[in-house]
Amino acid sequence: VDNVLWHHKSLFVQIKDTRNDFPLSGVIGVQHWAQWGGTSTNPKIGKQPQSIKDLIRVICGSEGGGDATVSDQINVLGNHYGSYDFKLAFTQPNWQVSAYYQHFFEDKSGMIFVNNTDGLWGGQLDLPKFPWLRKVVVEYLVTRDQSGQFHFIDFDHDLHPGVGGGGDDYYNNGEYTTGASYFNRA
């Protein structure tokens, strides 16, 4: 897609005892990036919507209007990347241990946690005064759920009731096929 527009926002809140009387602290936040607008090199897709109304749709993670592709009308307008970040830490004078979870999303289903526990789970031990080991980090990446079984949008909803989902196919997008790349590099 040529002449792509980008949107980014992030907000983090840290809860911490500034007098160091209480050892627990926490961080909660959100990061959100979106590619939108531009003109696809695929003639079947063509020019993507990019009005002020479409910008508001992108900022809010809403589905596209009537001038968007069918997939963007069903899901969200544009190509979205983001995460909800959670961290809990326990601090002592000579060490700190923390656990964190980054719940990533690429579309509406991930934004509303339909992709369940997909994300990055981690733990960290900080030893600032230890002579030869300062930090130990353990992380576990889960991508198995991808919002459930694959879409059944084309099926008869009377015969197959429920909400379609699945097939998130992380970091791939039907309209923005090169993703977040510059000169075909990530």
Locate each region found by the language model.
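Signature for the C-terminal beta-barrel architecture of outer-membrane proteins
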Residues: V1-H160
